């Protein structure tokens, strides 16, 4: 999109207060919850993007539904708890919890309507492409015979028909549980009865009929298949009415501040979470009103917690459709590259790092290099110690296996396992016990702080002294998500960074606050201060008439202090470009407040997850003298105040150039996957300016090598240099 177009849009956007008043008004912030819903709207819009293959569009629809489930389990649950407890504290944008709930429900209702409309269109489109989802009444005679055999062999044994009467009270329904409610009449005497059938959660939602006549794949949902054979479950009864419902429960964990055994404490809290209060009840529109009221009363839900859905429930499960064998309807497979510099050294990653710092750009470059770093450490007789943080990792994690191998080889191994990683708590308890059994020193960090920093440290004997090798990154030690999340892995043997990381581990394990961090910044101690100092520095350069530029890339921008510092910088004339995938509480493009701030969001094939912060230092951007950092932290109060995070400077010239001039420029240059954020928090798709070629950053990185990992092959083939068109100067 042309800068002039964005400016025009911003000028037309009404603001609720005069410019000279908004700078000190709560209206200078966008509501966090509504901003998140705007983000999820962008995800949903990808399901109608004609550039995406059909099954990828289904995947985006499924992701938007899954996102919404988690939003209710965590954010809405928290706001409802505030309302229940009579808390009227206003959010930074000036809304009470009750006001926020009202706006959330209005926005979600429209979002849900749009999801169903998109699914109806996608279902028709899939049918045209040879993937047909049939309703129960539309199965052929042969299909009915097959599905009956399949039902009796694979579904019937898993179902438990539940009559509801004084002797059989309404059962507990787990969060995200999918249930069919029935109104039945006994054939012998006409006596009415209500009943439930809970759909089993461990089998596929979509059942594929055998064969594919003329290449057409036909499927039926689990609930439709079950409805064909209700008589098998309730013989002697006639169905008078039925409908499915689904609930979402509060999934927040409350923990005591004093606990002798943190693992046992979390195990107890997880059991409580399974029985959290119902915060959302989704009911099929086809369910009779009397039956609907019966379900609502049994679950003790209020009217504003009930959402009547005219369509399919549990849209998060639509992703299962992408398993059908139609690779022509998916993104072409992509195989990540391996850094050539490591190959130049015969696979010796320590030698590659000793040569100079290395940055690996996932998923374009393989996460295997991170696993290799730890595997080589585990098997190297000169390695004496390994320290590792674990926030989220995969099932059957190679990282955990390698730490076990290292401990069994007699090395000193310390693992910080974060028990408070939401929805991964149970897995992390399991990993912690496996590691302890192998002899790993397992610590759990702080009760009040989550350890979100991504750190791995290897201490190796070299030439009579010890050398510390460090890996720090923007993403989790998770080989599965590393294939779809864009993140950065930074490897260095810089002794100063090594000392800083050692101090961070000592802080986590021994609670002693580091007072002499040299290069890095650490939250909750110094990270916010470092960021604000840099923003103020650019503000000062602007006031002196020097070039003043800030580029930032993050998942979320929420922190009021950071936002206010950026507003002040904008008013001083600093040119600020922000790439914020998710929540953004800053209002861009408001005259007199944020004229010089542009915000974009990138939504595409890969999930943008890296955090990069760049400051021109009086030279503008890009510049070899710029301050460039990567971090595990977003600019949110939780990251800056309630988590252990690190901000790491990139000072090696090649690494610095790759992140600033290749990765950041590509993100800013992208037009095919980008949205421009508007002052009201909504967004509009960007388009290439007149005369400018459309640019897709994901395609660029899939087809162009990185700089720092190229080794000697860089002389033979260099990545295509990126340039950006001139933009209007800051006012």
UniProtKB/Swiss-Prot annotation:
UniProt-listed CDD domains: PLDc_PaPPK1_C1_like, PLDc_PaPPK1_C2_like
EC class of the enzyme, as a word: transferase
Cofactor: Mg(2+)
Protein residues bound to Mg(2+): 392, 422
Catalytic activity: [phosphate](n) + ATP = [phosphate](n+1) + ADP
Active-site residues per Swiss-Prot or TrEMBL entry: 452
PTM: An intermediate of this reaction is the autophosphorylated ppk in which a phosphate is covalently linked to a histidine residue through a N-P bond.
UniProt cross-references to Pfam families, sorted A to Z: PP_kinase, PP_kinase_C, PP_kinase_C_1, PP_kinase_N
GO BP, one annotated term: polyphosphate biosynthetic process
Cited InterPro entries: PP_kinase, PP_kinase_C_1, PP_kinase_middle, PP_kinase_middle_dom_sf, PPK_C_dom2, PPK_N_dom, PPK_N_dom_sf
Region feature Disordered, mapped onto this chain: 701-731
EC number: 2.7.4.1
One example GO MF annotation: metal ion binding
Binding positions (ATP): 67, 485, 581, 609
Keyword terms: ATP-binding, Kinase, Magnesium, Metal-binding, Nucleotide-binding, Phosphoprotein, Transferase
Domain of life: Bacteria
GO cellular component, one term: polyphosphate kinase complex
Basic and acidic residues compositional bias, start-end: 713-731
NCBIfam families membership: poly_P_kin, PRK05443.1-1, PRK05443.1-2, PRK05443.1-4, PRK05443.2-2
Family membership: Belongs to the polyphosphate kinase 1 (PPK1) family.
Protein task: Catalyzes the reversible transfer of the terminal phosphate of ATP to form a long-chain polyphosphate (polyP).
Protein known as: Polyphosphate kinase
Biological source species: Bradyrhizobium sp. (strain ORS 278)
């Amino acid at each position: 999109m042309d800068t002039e177009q964005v400016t025009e849009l911003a000028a037309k956007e009404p603001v609720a207060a005069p410019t000279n008043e908004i700078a000190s008004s709560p209206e200078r912030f966008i509501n966090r919850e509504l901003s998140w819903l705007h983000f999820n709207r962008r995800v949903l819009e990808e399901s109608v993007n004609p550039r995406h293959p059909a099954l990828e569009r289904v995947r985006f629809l499924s992701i938007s539904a899954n996102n919404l489930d988690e939003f209710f389990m965590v954010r809405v649950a928290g706001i409802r708890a505030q309302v229940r407890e009579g808390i009227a504290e206003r959010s930074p944008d000036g809304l009470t919890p009750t006001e926020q709930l009202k706006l959330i429900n209005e926005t979600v209702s429209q979002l849900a309507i749009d999801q169903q409309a998109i699914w109806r269109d996608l279902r028709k489109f899939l049918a045209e492409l040879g993937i047909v989802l049939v309703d129960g009444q539309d199965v052929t005679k042969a299909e009915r015979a097959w599905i009956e055999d399949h039902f009796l062999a694979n579904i019937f044994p898993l179902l438990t028909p539940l009559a509801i009467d004084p002797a059989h009270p309404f059962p507990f329904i787990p969060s995200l549980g999918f249930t069919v409610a029935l109104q039945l009449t006994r054939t012998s005497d006409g006596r009415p009865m209500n009943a439930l059938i809970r759909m089993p959660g461990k089998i596929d939602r979509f059942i594929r009929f055998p064969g594919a006549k003329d290449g057409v794949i036909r499927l039926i949902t689990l609930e439709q298949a079950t409805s064909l054979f209700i008589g098998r479950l309730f013989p002697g009864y006639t169905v008078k009415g039925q409908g499915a419902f689904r609930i979402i429960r509060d999934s927040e964990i409350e923990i005591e501040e004093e606990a002798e055994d943190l693992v046992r404490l979390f195990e107890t809290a997880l059991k409580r979470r399974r029985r959290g209060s119902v915060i959302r009840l989704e009911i099929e529109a086809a369910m009779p009103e009397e039956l609907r009221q019966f379900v609502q009363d049994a679950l003790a839900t209020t009217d504003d917690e009930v959402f009547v859905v005219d369509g399919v429930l549990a849209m998060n499960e639509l992703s299962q459709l992408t398993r059908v064998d139609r690779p022509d309807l998916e993104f072409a497979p992509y195989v990540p590259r391996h850094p050539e510099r490591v190959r130049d050294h015969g696979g010796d990653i320590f030698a590659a790092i000793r040569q100079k710092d290395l940055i690996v750009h996932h998923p374009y470059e393989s996460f295997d290099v991170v696993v290799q770093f730890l595997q080589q450490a585990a098997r190297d007789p000169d390695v004496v110690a390994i320290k590792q943080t674990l926030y989220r990792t995969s099932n059957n994690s190679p990282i955990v296996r390698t730490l076990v191998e290292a401990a069994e080889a007699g090395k000193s191994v310390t693992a910080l396992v974060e028990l408070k990683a939401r929805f991964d708590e149970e897995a992390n308890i399991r990993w912690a016990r496996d590691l302890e059994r192998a002899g790993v020193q397992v610590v759990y960090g702080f009760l009040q702080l989550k350890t979100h920093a991504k750190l791995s440290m290897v201490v190796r004997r070299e030439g009579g002294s010890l050398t510390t090798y460090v890996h720090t990154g923007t993403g989790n030690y998770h080989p599965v998500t590393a294939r779809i999340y864009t993140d950065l892995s930074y490897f260095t043997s810089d002794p100063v960074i090594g000392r800083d990381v050692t101090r961070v581990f000592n802080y986590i394990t021994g609670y002693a606050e580091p007072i002499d961090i040299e290069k890095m910044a650490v939250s909750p101690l110094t990270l916010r201060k470092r960021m604000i100092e840099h923003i103020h520095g650019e503000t000062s350069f602007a006031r002196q008439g020097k070039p003043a530029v800030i580029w930032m890339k993050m998942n979320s921008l929420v922190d009021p202090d950071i936002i206010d510092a950026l507003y002040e910088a904008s008013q001083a004339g600093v040119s600020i470009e922000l790439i914020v995938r998710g929540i953004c509480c800053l209002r861009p493009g408001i005259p007199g407040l944020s004229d010089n701030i542009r915000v974009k969001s990138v939504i595409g094939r890969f999930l943008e997850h890296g955090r990069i912060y760049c400051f021109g230092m009086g030279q503008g951007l890009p510049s070899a003298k710029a301050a460039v950092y990567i971090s595990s932290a977003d600019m949110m109060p939780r990251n800056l105040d309630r988590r252990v995070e690190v901000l790491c400077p990139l000072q090696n010239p090649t690494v610095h150039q790759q992140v600033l001039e290749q990765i950041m420029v590509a993100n800013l240059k992208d037009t095919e996957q980008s949205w421009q954020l508007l002052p009201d928090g909504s967004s509009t798709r960007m388009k290439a300016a007149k005369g400018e070629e459309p640019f897709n950053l994901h395609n660029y990185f899939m087809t162009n090598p990185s700089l720092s990992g190229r080794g000697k092959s860089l002389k033979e083939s260099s990545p295509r240099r990126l340039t950006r068109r001139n933009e209007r100067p800051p006012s």
